[in-house]
């Protein structure tokens, strides 16, 4: 985080004026294994323009995400537009220094600057695109990490996408 950021414990009245690009959301902060994670929901139009993805195919030295699959994103958008359907799982993000992410414990307010590339998508790029392409303007459940370097973001992406166990085919047949 930028050294210009006020402390998360600093009272709001002592914080410097924020610019018109500042966004504030009610959030819950947890500290897990040395990492701060903030859980909230953000309207897609406040999230999508300020998020970015480091794709391996576009940047082999620093990228770690899969190639964008428009068909998959459109399928998600169609699903989200269907009455009674929802996606409860969150999109995992990493606040970049430019986001100037701050959290006020007393009011449970999470703030970040609306600037390009403020939030790196660690997991959920196709869900994010699906929300963006959907004709309905949903609020998106997110988990936002702060203070991660790019190597940690990549490791977290790999952990999320390789260490979970899929549902056995037999169980899928029974549930359907």
Model regions: which residues?
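Basic- and aromatic-enriched surface patches that contact anionic nucleotides/nucleic acids
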Residues: 3-11, 65, 84-89, 93, ...
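N-terminal extension/subdomain marker
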Residues: 1-88, 97-102
């Amino acid at each position: 985080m930028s050294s210009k950021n006020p402390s998360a414990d600093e009272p709001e009245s002592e914080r410097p004026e924020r610019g018109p690009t500042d966004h504030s959301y009610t959030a819950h902060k947890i500290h897990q294994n040395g990492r701060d994670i903030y859980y909230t929901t953000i309207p897609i139009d406040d999230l999508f323009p300020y998020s970015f993805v480091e794709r391996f195919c576009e940047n082999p030295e620093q990228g770690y995400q899969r190639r964008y699959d428009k068909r998959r994103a459109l399928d998600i958008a169609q699903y989200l537009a269907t009455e009674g359907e929802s996606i409860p799982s969150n999109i995992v993000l990493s606040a970049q220094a430019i986001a100037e992410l701050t959290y006020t414990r007393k009011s449970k307010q999470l703030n970040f600057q609306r600037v390009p590339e403020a939030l790196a998508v660690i997991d959920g790029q196709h869900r994010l695109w699906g929300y963006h392409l959907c004709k309905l303007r949903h609020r998106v459940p997110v988990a936002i990490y702060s203070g991660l370097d790019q190597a940690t973001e990549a490791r977290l992406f790999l952990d999320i996408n390789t260490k979970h166990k899929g549902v056995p085919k037999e169980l899928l047949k029974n549930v359907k």
